[in-house]
Swiss-Prot record:
Pathway: Protein biosynthesis; polypeptide chain elongation. One of its GO terms (molecular function) is translation elongation factor activity. One of its GO terms (cellular component) is cytoplasm. InterPro entries: Elong-fact-P_C (IPR015365), NA-bd_OB-fold (IPR012340), Rib_uL2_dom2 (IPR014722), Transl_elong_fac_P/YeiP (IPR020599), Transl_elong_KOW-like (IPR013185), Transl_elong_P/YeiP_cen (IPR001059), Transl_elong_P/YeiP_CS (IPR013852), Transl_elongation_fac_P (IPR011768). The keyword Heme does not apply. It holds the Pfam family EFP_N. GO terms for biological process: peptide biosynthetic process. This is Elongation factor P. It comes from Clostridium novyi (strain NT).
Length: 185
């Protein structure tokens, strides 16, 4: 059992016979009255999103989630194909299942696929990835004095903010959990 006060992004639990993953949460402590936890939940099976409020002391049944590392192979435009490294079985996933991770995944990279009762429902990119910048404004000499940022498009299509001194064609390390630039490689 998990307490509603312990809910965090990515926590998966069962509620009313359905399995939900926390997308967003907020602990609210009003000046008058009892505290509560406001959550935005995604149904693991249907993909539907709902907002629910919990008492922080409410107990929820934690769902048993299997995590498996798989290799991202390719996309045919609609589906994204991942391969199990042990059985070489390929599984297709739709955009809703991969939307958070796919912007940081190149072909042949490894990712964590989450399964509930044998059905894949979510993809987690590695915490840090190294990607090349394919489009950004050129850096100008002397732009290292401030911590100003500029948008840069990566080879996967993701757009991240990078310091002014980073140029097109360079490879950078990105934190996939936040989408933030970490360093040049």
């Amino acid at each position: 059992m998990i307490s509603a006060g312990d809910l965090r992004k990515g926590t998966t639990f069962e509620l009313d016979g359905q399995v939900y993953t926390v997308i967003d949460f907020l602990h609210v402590k009003p000046g008058k009255g009892a505290a509560f936890v406001r959550t935005k939940l995604r149904n693991v099976i249907s993909g539907g999103v709902t907002e629910t409020t919990f008492n922080p002391t409410a107990k929820l049944q934690e769902a048993v989630i299997e995590r498996k590392e798989m290799q991202y192979l390719y996309s045919d435009g609609e589906l994204y194909y991942f391969m199990d490294q042990e059985t070489f079985e390929q599984i297709p996933l739709n955009f809703e299942q991969v939307e958070n991770a796919i912007k940081f995944l190149k072909e042949n990279m490894f990712a964590i696929i989450k399964f509930y009762k044998g059905a894949a429902f979510s993809v987690e990119a590695p915490n840090f990835v190294e990607l090349q910048i394919v489009e950004c404004e050129p850096g100008i000499k002397g732009n290292t004095a401030t911590n100003a940022m500029k948008p840069a498009k990566l080879e996967t299509g993701a757009v991240v903010n990078v310091p002014l001194f980073v140029n097109e064609g360079e490879t950078i390390r990105v934190d996939t959990r936040t989408g933030d630039y970490m360093e040049r490689v």
